[in-house]
UniProtKB/Swiss-Prot annotation:
This is Homoserine O-succinyltransferase. Transfers a succinyl group from succinyl-CoA to L-homoserine, forming succinyl-L-homoserine. Substrate binds at K163, S192, R249. Pathway: Amino-acid biosynthesis; L-methionine biosynthesis via de novo pathway; O-succinyl-L-homoserine from L-homoserine: step 1/1. The gene is metAS. Pfam families: HTS. HAMAP family: MetA_acyltransf. The lineage of its organism: Bacteria, Pseudomonadati, Pseudomonadota, Gammaproteobacteria, Alteromonadales. It comes from Psychromonas ingrahamii (strain DSM 17664 / CCUG 51855 / 37).
Length: 305
């Protein structure tokens, strides 16, 4: 949140020069405040787990956020009770005639499948295109980030033979940008994907700003110049046990996965993992919600272009 100070206070210019978020009294007096409207398109199999993880991060700000959950279609889910979906989820057609402050599109366990072979690919493209004109800022997570980068920029993902699974150390760039304000120079974040995007290729073929990457894992965080599209190729929302559960799932399916790196204490899968990425995840969501959504969204969403 910004600090409200007198227009004439000598400290004002100093704070602004240090990129501290200040707001003049004259601007503050003109602000109208209302709850933010945030939409979540949940593509993950375990929807209750995922919606809880994301809402936990969305709630960690002083802002009031009204959340609505949607699904891509009404197909039956193997991992989420029908009663839960019918009660708490809407179809896209029900919300598409409204405008929204923020939109989160989750990942999906589809990393080895070509995008055009995903049964809801056309619907996904429709939703992404809709979001460009009806949402102040959209946050794409993991598979959704890969899919959106391919659709919006024609960027081709590099599919690895082995899965990137574990906690990876990332480098922060453009430290003074609001999206990464407060980030450490390096931070840990969970990854669970087969795809990666090379930083140099993305820089040369798009207008995206790359805010974080890893030498052995490619881009982690990038955004369009106006931050209306923000891409996260990992899972800052994951609980401490999520990667463990995915690892066990892949073992049961006979996929012979490698043990997640930098995850189990002493590399012993019998020891309880510790979440060393939680503060970064909270800060990322807080910055996105504050600087990319709250500070730029119109009071009357009908004015959103």
């Amino acid at each position: 949140m910004p600090i409200r100070i007198s227009d004439d206070l000598p400290a004002a210019d100093i704070l602004r020069s240090e990129n501290i978020f200040t707001m003049s009294e004259s601007r503050a007096s003109l602000q109208n405040i209302r709850p933010l409207r945030v939409l979540i398109l949940n593509l993950m199999p375990k929807k209750i787990e995922t919606e809880t993880q994301i809402m936990r991060l969305l709630s960690n700000t002083p802002l009031q956020v009204n959340v609505e959950l949607i699904r891509v279609d009404a197909r039956a889910s193997r991992n989420t009770p029908k009663e839960h979906l019918d009660k708490f989820y809407s179809d896209f057609d029900r919300v598409k005639n409204q405008k929204w402050d923020g939109f989160v599109i989750t990942g999906a366990p589809l990393g080895q499948l070509p995008f055009e072979d995903v049964y809801y690919w056309e619907k996904f493209v429709e939703i992404v295109e809709w979001s460009r004109h009806n949402v102040t800022s959209t946050l794409f997570l993991c598979w959704a980030a890969q899919a959106a980068l391919t659709y919006l920029y024609g960027l081709k993902k590099e599919t690895r033979g082995d899965k990137l699974s574990g906690i990876y150390l990332h480098r922060t760039h453009h430290h003074h940008h609001p999206l990464v304000r407060g980030f450490d120079d390096e931070f840990w974040a969970p990854l669970s994907r087969f795809a990666e995007f090379n930083s140099e290729v993305v820089s040369e073929n798009s207008d995206l700003t790359i805010f974080a990457d890893a030498p052995n894992a490619g881009i982690y965080l990038a955004a369009s110049p106006d931050c209306r599209q923000v891409y996260v190729t990992g899972h800052p929302e994951y609980d401490a046990s999520t990667l463990h559960n995915e690892y066990l799932r892949d073992l049961e399916e006979g996929l012979e996965p490698k043990q997640p790196v930098n995850y189990y204490p002493d590399n012993d899968q019998n020891k309880t993992p510790r979440a060393i990425w939680r503060s970064h995840g909270n800060l990322l969501y807080s910055n996105w919600l504050n600087y990319c959504v709250y500070q730029v969204t119109p009071y009357d969403l009908a004015d959103l272009i």
